[in-house]
């Protein structure tokens, strides 16, 4: 009998084992669709980004004009740019929902997969930040100035580090050039990390909504989940393309339509919406180093989540107290996002401080306490 090429060819075998014959739990819900959606986001961003890079000039005197040129003179340049700009927003929507799913269902107990995932989030945040600087508008320039300046809070080496990062004494041409280099490189680092993420995931197999072993009831990925993923793609691409075509500037800052001017500071410097929660935490501490540490901790706390798991159950499906805490945390993050977009004045300052305090308290203190309480109530 002839060998099945799909199962025996050195390259096709890898694809087969991860996308076709992969044994998958039979009960994973739509919350498990976001991994493949993130893959689609990454591919979209790399393709549109490559097309934009062909027309972009990484020079302070030409960057803004080159972006305008793409939108005016390049065939479908406006569409490519709008897809790339809004693709970043959808990338973050998907990754936040994906992390939320992992948190709710206890997927973080696959520690290697989770830790690589957190590294992926950090790489994505770095990519988005350096990318936002490239159009060289007002918010690009001042955003870069404010965020890179945070490194100067590091004791002893801070100032030297910032000047080394800038390539001078302020954000200028060398900064823009290196940021373009980083923005081009990092997505490929993300693609590499994604393969590592999947490699670790396929060592253990997917978790499921019940948080129990599912080896006794696995089904092949194709056709069941391949068709489900296609539905997910359609449901994401429809709002994504609608946003890019009907209101492409909805999520952007109008300040970025003004070319960068080091002599005029915008009245309200704020990052894109997906960084606002962290920005609110940064601003809520009236001390530079303290704010920087809180900012770093707001994302790095994700590394601690597997260590803080004290429940005897993996998933939150049958833990109503933890569920209440989880949705309180979600609401808290939405409050932080809103506060981050507001000016630094009363009552936003105190709201931001309370929300920041609540964020760390819920994750580091309340979740372990409530989990232990649930164990006791269930006599586990």
Swiss-Prot record:
It holds the Pfam family Cytochrome_B. The cytochrome bc1 complex contains 11 subunits: 3 respiratory subunits (MT-CYB, CYC1 and UQCRFS1), 2 core proteins (UQCRC1 and UQCRC2) and 6 low-molecular weight proteins (UQCRH/QCR6, UQCRB/QCR7, UQCRQ/QCR8, UQCR10/QCR9, UQCR11/QCR10 and a cleavage product of UQCRFS1). This cytochrome bc1 complex then forms a dimer. One of its GO terms (molecular function) is ubiquinol-cytochrome-c reductase activity. Keywords: Electron transport, Heme, Iron, Membrane, Metal-binding, Mitochondrion, Mitochondrion inner membrane, Respiratory chain, Transmembrane, Transmembrane helix, Transport, Ubiquinone. InterPro entries: Cyt_b/b6_C (IPR005798), Cyt_b/b6_C_sf (IPR036150), Cyt_b/b6_N (IPR005797), Cytb/b6-like_sf (IPR027387), Cytochrome_b (IPR030689), Cytochrome_b_C_euk/bac (IPR048260), Cytochrome_b_N_euk/bac (IPR048259), Di-haem_cyt_TM (IPR016174). One of its GO terms (cellular component) is mitochondrial inner membrane. The gene is MT-CYB. It is a multi-pass membrane protein. Its cofactor is heme b. Heme b b566 binds at residues 98, 197. The chain crosses the membrane at residues 34-54, 78-99, 114-134, 179-199, 227-247, 289-309, 321-341, 348-368. CDD domains: cytochrome_b_C (cd00290), Cytochrome_b_N (cd00284). This is Cytochrome b. It is found in: Mitochondrion inner membrane. Heme b b562 binds at residues 84, 183. Its main location: mitochondrion. A ubiquinone binds at residue 202. Heme 1 (or BL or b562) is low-potential and absorbs at about 562 nm, and heme 2 (or BH or b566) is high-potential and absorbs at about 566 nm. Belongs to the cytochrome b family. The keyword Hydrolase does not apply. Component of the ubiquinol-cytochrome c reductase complex (complex III or cytochrome b-c1 complex) that is part of the mitochondrial respiratory chain. The b-c1 complex mediates electron transfer from ubiquinol to cytochrome c. Contributes to the generation of a proton gradient across the mitochondrial membrane that is then used for ATP synthesis. One of its GO terms (biological process) is mitochondrial electron transport, ubiquinol to cytochrome c. Binds 2 heme b groups non-covalently.
């Amino acid at each position: 009998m002839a060998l099945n090429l799909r199962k025996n060819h050195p390259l096709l075998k890898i694809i087969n084992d991860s996308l076709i014959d992969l044994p998958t739990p039979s009960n994973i819900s739509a919350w498990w669709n976001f991994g493949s959606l993130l893959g689609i986001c990454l591919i979209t961003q790399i393709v549109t980004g490559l097309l934009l890079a062909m027309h972009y000039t990484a020079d302070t005197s030409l960057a803004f004009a080159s972006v305008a040129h793409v939108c005016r003179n390049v065939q479908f340049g406006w569409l490519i740019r709008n897809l790339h700009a809004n693709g970043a927003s959808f990338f973050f929507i998907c990754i936040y929902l994906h992390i939320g799913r992992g948190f709710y269902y206890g997927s973080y107990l696959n520690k290697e997969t989770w830790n690589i995932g957190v590294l992926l989030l950090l790489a994505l945040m770095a990519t988005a930040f350096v990318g936002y600087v490239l159009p060289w508008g007002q918010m690009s320039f001042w955003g870069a100035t404010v965020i890179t300046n945070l490194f100067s809070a590091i004791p002893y080496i801070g100032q030297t580090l910032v000047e080394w990062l800038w390539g001078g004494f302020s954000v200028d041409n060398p900064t823009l050039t290196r940021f373009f280099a980083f923005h081009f490189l990092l997505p490929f680092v993300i693609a590499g990390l994604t393969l590592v993420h999947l490699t670790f995931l396929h060592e253990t197999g997917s978790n499921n909504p019940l948080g129990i072993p599912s080896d006794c009831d696995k089904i092949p990925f194709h056709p069941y989940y391949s068709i489900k993923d296609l539905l997910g793609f359609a449901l994401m691409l429809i709002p994504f393309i609608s946003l890019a075509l009907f209101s492409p500037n909805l999520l952007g800052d109008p300040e970025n339509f003004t070319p960068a001017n080091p002599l005029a500071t915008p009245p309200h410097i704020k990052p894109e919406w997906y960084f606002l929660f962290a920005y609110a935490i940064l601003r809520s501490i009236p001390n530079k180093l303290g704010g920087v540490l809180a900012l770093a901790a707001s994302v790095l706390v994700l590394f601690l989540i597997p260590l803080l798991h004290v429940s005897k159950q993996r998933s939150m499906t049958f833990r109503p107290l933890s569920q209440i805490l989880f949705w309180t945390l979600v609401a808290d993050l939405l409050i932080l996002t809103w506060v981050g977009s507001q000016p630094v004045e009363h009552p936003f300052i105190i709201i931001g401080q309370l929300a920041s305090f609540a964020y760390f308290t819920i994750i580091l203190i309340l979740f372990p306490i409530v989990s232990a309480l649930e164990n006791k109530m269930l006599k586990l």
